[in-house]
Regions:
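Bacterial carbohydrate/catabolite-sensing allosteric modules
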Residues: 1-3, 46, 84-95, 132, ...
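Amphipathic helical "hinge" segments at domain boundaries
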Residues: 38, 47-114, 119-122, 200-203, ...
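Short beta->alpha connector loops
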Residues: 102-105, 126-131, 249
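N-terminal helix-turn-helix DNA-binding module of bacterial transcription factors
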Residues: 1-64, 333, 342
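Short beta-strand segments enriched in small/hydrophobic residues
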Residues: 14, 19-24, 58-74, 84, ...
Length: 342
């Protein structure tokens, strides 16, 4: 059994090409004819050749590795988004390193320091906070980064989010059009710009209709907190006739609480609208009307922006907002003139 590593020179000899050609075949985006690529890959497979990515990174000055920092995967939206991001970067010959951190800026700073030690080419911060100190360090070292699904007050930073204010307003307009007068909001974490903007859009939509919110409560994107908030909303003599929930993850908990714990009919007694349109929203169990946060389009935009910054030295495009479409199912009363669209 052979114990020594197969070399590029051996592959080149068997394939009948030069050694630099072998290197180019295994370097993403290098120009090599399709015929020579087939020769080299066939020879590599026969010999059991494995490209030396470390050596290539030393030659090119790039690791072809992207670091992704996430706060959690409990929300199905992030599971889908991570899959889309990984596939997008793999298609361009990049590998992914995933790190987890809490939403505290200090924890994120520490994790990013680890990523920098791994010589990543770029960083995606997915729904986590970052300090001004970290922003300055990344800019100082010339490490491109994109904020995914997390806006920052500094709109010059590269970020990709849903149009959260508009989405919140559309949720309010839809519920008002359905004849609801007492609309509550189980809001997302108010220390995140996304949560604040969805709340602000919702309140603006109600104000335009001459309505005040029944009640607004920050549930931190946590199911258990959303369950408790739902019970509290229905514990007194006055109750809401509709609830806009800051994301689907919490909306599922709200629906279960309304139906199973409180014995209420949805949408007969109360309408529910979520935000994200994760796959589970279409399940018959939930049949959730929601605002679609398009993970695929957001991931495509994020990949494109970060690669342009890495490979072309492109400047930050600032904040990119992608429209959230209203997906009408069966958890909310449907206004006249509208129909289910999913």
């Amino acid at each position: 059994m052979r114990k020594t590593r197969v070399t590029a020179a051996e592959v080149a000899k068997l394939a009948g090409v030069s050694q630099p050609t072998v290197s180019r075949v295994f370097t993403p985006n290098s120009k090599v004819s399709k015929e020579k690529q087939e020769w080299v890959r066939d020879a590599a497979q026969q010999l059991g050749y494995l490209p030396n990515t470390l050596a290539r990174s030393l030659n090119t000055g790039r690791s072809r590795t992207i670091g992704i920092v996430l706060a959690y995967l409990k929300n199905p939206f992030y599971t889908e988004a991570l899959e889309k991001l990984s596939a997008g970067f793999r298609a361009h010959g990049y590998h992914i390193m995933t790190f987890f951190a809490s939403n505290m800026a200090e924890d994120v700073d520490e994790v990013v320091e680890d990523l920098l030690a791994h010589q990543v080419d770029g960083i995606i911060l997915a729904s986590v906070s970052m300090s001004n100190t970290l922003t300055g360090r990344l800019q100082h070292y010339g490490i491109p980064f994109v904020l995914f699904n997390r806006g920052q007050p500094d709109r010059s930073l590269a970020s990709v989010t849903a149009a959260n204010f508009d989405g919140g307003r559309r949720a309010a307009e839809f519920l008002v059009a359905g004849g609801h007068k007492h609309i509550a909001h189980i809001a997302g974490w108010q220390k995140s710009l996304n949560g604040r903007e969805r709340r602000a859009g919702f309140l603006a939509g109600l104000q335009e209709a001459g309505l005040a919110p029944f009640h607004v409560v920050d549930c931190h994107y946590r199911r258990a907190v959303a369950v408790e908030a739902t019970r509290n909303l229905f514990s007194g003599p006055r109750v809401p006739d509709a609830i806009f929930v800051g994301n689907d993850h919490m909306a599922f908990a709200v629906l279960e609480t309304l139906r199973e714990d409180l014995g209420l009919s949805v949408p007969g007694d109360v309408s529910v609208v979520g935000y994200d349109d994760v796959a589970m929203a279409a399940w018959k169990t939930f049949d959730l009307t929601t605002l679609r946060q398009p993970a695929n389009r957001m991931a495509e935009a994020t990949v494109s922006i970060l690669l342009s910054m890495i490979e072309n030295g492109a400047a930050s495009p600032g904040r990119i907002e992608i429209e959230s479409a209203l997906v009408i199912r069966g958890s909310a009363r449907i206004p006249k003139g509208l129909t289910r669209n999913a």
